[in-house]
Swiss-Prot record:
Probably serves a role in the transport of a small ligand released during the hydrolysis of milk fat. It comes from Notamacropus eugenii (Tammar wallaby). One of its GO terms (molecular function) is small molecule binding. It holds the Pfam family Lipocalin. Its main location: secreted. CDD domains: lipocalin_1_3_4_13-like. The gene is LLPA. Disulfide bonds join 78-171. This is Late lactation protein A. The keyword Transport applies. Residues 1-18 form the signal peptide. GO terms for cellular component: extracellular space. Mammary gland specific. Secreted in milk.
Amino acid sequence: MRVLFLTISLSLFSIIHADDFAFSEFKPSEGTYYVQVIAVDKEFPEDEIPRDISPLTITYLNNGKMEAKFTVKKDNNCEEINLTLEKIDEPRKITTTRHLHHICDTVRTSEEKYWILSCVREFQGTQIREAELVGPNTDENPKALEDFYRFINRERFVERRIITPRQTEACTSENA
């Protein structure tokens, strides 16, 4: 569940622009975004690997921050997750806040509306790195994927630890 939470969090990070523009100057479209592919640099327990991911819904808040919503389903229970996203003073970095506070790098691909997120966090006492490619639809974009693979090779991720999650509909407590 924690890995899925981080996975979705990372996806949301990528919605924010990768350049040094101020957060208020770049406003990605509100709407739905999809995690295309995920890479991790460490082995994960099989039950923690995010295989199914719901779409992310992005909206702007009155305070200039963004909110990202998605759902997770585990053990037949549905939970809606709300994250707050905020640009920070460091170039190409954003924070996400729910219970924990994470800082991630955002990298723009050569394709419009496709981003790579790269975060470091702790999982079961070990630091892990995770990178995700996020885009505006579920269609495979070869150029964005090529950028992602170049990025993970440059950052020395192991290609056998790449996950292509299945896109699922958001769950509700009624259909859990």
